[in-house]
């Protein structure tokens, strides 16, 4: 009698569909997954511990590198935690700028997710189209911070600087003729807000393009419909947030339920799924692209009409302007103390969370009155989502496991921390 045994397969961490450094130990019966055991920790960098050894302002850059696709949203949760402990409120213009860039970040995240998921499932064209739009938004990051990804733009009490009046332009070179340069610089003649407004006018057509390629595509639907179904009850029990929770039919969004920044001043809808499968999660994220575009347009309209300060006028928390610092001794001392020692927070604890593109990104901060946190705990949405992978994937084929993993939108920078 031949003894039949289940087959054990290692998936990742080098696999291109592993979304970073995920290692899955899969138990297979033929091609059907019987059990999945995710192994994490291969990107652990001790971010929480590092933040506990540095002044508050020096850890903003660490936040960018957690979920390195949702940079400014991570910063937002961190600086909001500091602001709550300090008891300060950023100016309204800073709140609108934060809201606008949170939505720019959401579009950046969802475009990468859409392109990578399509590529995993076998559709390459969408991947190229998504990266075409991402480049324009990275130009906005670069215009305000000088960096295309890890911006470190948000600050306790506001943002680092106001929006620029000019956009970087392409210069003539031997690789591009004048006609090409003129075409590339067509939308770069005005300010950042003008550039972003032009983007929001053409972006809905781009989303229609993606949907034309995927939404009614027979192969796409065969790979995603009724795959990885999660009921609303299970979604809550697993601790789902963001598109994973809304895809299962629960309209929970921190931007509406626990409003922060300027989200209570803008209009948008919360897309919700019905079935809780990979296809619903896809539709939710595509609709979020449209809603983010809508929010950005409202922010641009307000910012154009309302100039003003972008950070609190308190030299204990925010550095003085360089013009003042170079002529005033007191301002110079404040500047020096702020960047060498930082500032002290009153004793206490606080939890601050934002609706990041992947779900609820939270910062739990404990202060003992020093210039650095006594304890910093990061609540990453992807950790809860990956925990449910075994439950979601059981009984599915091996190829479906790739689609389910892609629908979770996993990034290991935040999971391993």
UniProtKB/Swiss-Prot annotation:
| Catalytic activity, reaction form | a quinone + NADH + 5 H(+)(in) = a quinol + NAD(+) + 4 H(+)(out)
The record's section on Pfam families has:
Complex1_49kDa (PF00346)
Q: Which GO terms describe its molecular function?
A: NAD binding; NADH:ubiquinone reductase (non-electrogenic) activity; quinone binding
Membrane topology per the record? Peripheral membrane protein
Q: What is its EC number?
A: 7.1.1.-
Q: Which residues cross the membrane?
A: none
Xref: PROSITE patterns: COMPLEX1_49K
Tell me where in or outside the cell this protein is found: Cell inner membrane
Write down the superkingdom of origin: Bacteria
Query: What does the UniProt keyword field contain?
Result: Cell inner membrane, Cell membrane, Membrane, NAD, Quinone, Translocase, Transport, Ubiquinone
Q: Does the keyword Zinc-finger belong to this entry?
A: no
Report whether Magnesium shows up as a keyword of the record.
no
What the entry lists under NCBIfam families is as follows: NuoD, PRK06075.1
What job does the chain carry out? NDH-1 shuttles electrons from NADH, via FMN and iron-sulfur (Fe-S) centers, to quinones in the respiratory chain. The immediate electron acceptor for the enzyme in this species is believed to be ubiquinone. Couples the redox reaction to proton translocation (for every two electrons transferred, four hydrogen ions are translocated across the cytoplasmic membrane), and thus conserves the redox energy in a proton gradient.
Fill in the subunit field for this protein: NDH-1 is composed of 14 different subunits. Subunits NuoB, C, D, E, F, and G constitute the peripheral sector of the complex.
- Protein's UniProt name: NADH-quinone oxidoreductase subunit D
């Amino acid at each position: 009698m031949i003894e039949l045994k289940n087959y054990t397969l290692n998936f990742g961490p080098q696999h291109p569909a592993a979304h970073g450094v995920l290692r899955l130990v899969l138990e297979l019966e033929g091609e059907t997954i019987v059990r999945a055991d995710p192994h994490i920790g291969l990107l652990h960098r001790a971010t929480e511990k590092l933040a506990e050894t540095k002044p508050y302002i020096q850890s903003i850059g660490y936040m960018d590198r957690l979920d390195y696709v949702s940079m400014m949203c991570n910063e937002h949760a961190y600086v909001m935690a500091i602001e709550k402990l300090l008891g300060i409120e950023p100016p309204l213009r800073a709140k609108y700028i934060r809201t606008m860039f949170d939505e720019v970040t959401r579009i950046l995240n969802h475009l990468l997710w859409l392109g990578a998921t399509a590529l995993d499932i076998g559709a390459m064209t969408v991947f190229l189209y998504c990266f075409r739009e991402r480049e324009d938004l990275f130009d906005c990051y670069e215009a305000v911070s000088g960096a295309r990804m890890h911006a470190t733009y948000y600050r306790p009490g506001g943002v680092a600087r106001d929006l620029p009046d000019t956009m970087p332009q392409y210069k003539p070179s031997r690789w591009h003729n004048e006609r090409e340069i003129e075409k590339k610089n067509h939308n770069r003649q005005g300010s950042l807000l003008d550039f972003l407004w032009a983007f929001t006018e053409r972006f809905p057509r781009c989303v229609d393009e993606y949907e034309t390629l995927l939404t009614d595509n027979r192969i796409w639907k065969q790979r995603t419909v009724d795959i990885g179904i999660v009921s609303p009850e299970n979604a809550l029990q697993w601790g789902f947030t963001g598109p994973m929770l809304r895809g299962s039919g629960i309209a929970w969004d921190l931007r509406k339920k626990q409003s922060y920044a300027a989200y209570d001043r803008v209009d948008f809808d919360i897309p919700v799924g019905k079935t809780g499968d990979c296809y619903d999660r896809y539709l939710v994220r595509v609709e979020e692209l449209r809603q983010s575009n809508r929010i950005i347009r409202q922010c641009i309209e307000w910012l154009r009409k309302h100039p003003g300060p972008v950070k609190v006028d308190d030299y204990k928390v925010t550095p003085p302007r360089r013009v003042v610092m170079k002529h005033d001794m007191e301002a110079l001392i404040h500047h020096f103390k702020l960047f060498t020692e930082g500032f002290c927070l009153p004793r206490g604890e606080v939890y601050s969370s934002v609706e990041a593109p992947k779900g609820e990104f939270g910062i739990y901060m404990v202060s003992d009155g020093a210039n650095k946190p006594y304890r910093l705990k990061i609540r990453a949405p992807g950790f809860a989502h990956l925990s449910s992978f075994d439950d979601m994937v059981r009984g599915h084929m091996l190829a479906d496991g790739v689609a389910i993993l892609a629908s979770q939108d996993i990034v290991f920078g935040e999971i391993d921390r």
